[in-house]
Amino acid sequence: MKSARRAAGLVSGLVAASALALVGATPASAAATWVLVDHPDFPQRICVHPERGWPSTYFHLPISGYWDTTIYGEVRNLPPGSYSDGGAVHPGDWDEDRQEFVGLVHVSIAPTPVGEYIAELWASDGTDTQTVPVVISVKEDCLGD
């Protein structure tokens, strides 16, 4: 009798789980929760020569957590004449074991005067937008220091 009840319980549990899978239900904990990763003591940094700039390079777009829509990224507040073509991290890019992904955001840095420029890397899923600072160092010798 106990084994019949146990079998009936298992069958009803399997039927309920199958029904939820068929209607596409996801647990509340699977809601999109992502973070644009920031390391304040070690911001992303690139160095360029003032006369050459860097016509095509990338900043990392480090996303941690879970997302179910595309997260777009771009860099703003760049030195004059510079631009960003942006980048994206798609839901399928997500590493389920690590719950993170590092995408790439394109930038082209124009020749610009020597100095240190603080730009802003932003990421958005269309609802939430997050930002972190990135540093562009412009100097004659990027290998010195």
Q: Could you describe each region identified by the protein language model?
A:
Residues 2-7, 14, 18-145:
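Long beta-sheet-rich domains in secretory-pathway and surface-associated proteins
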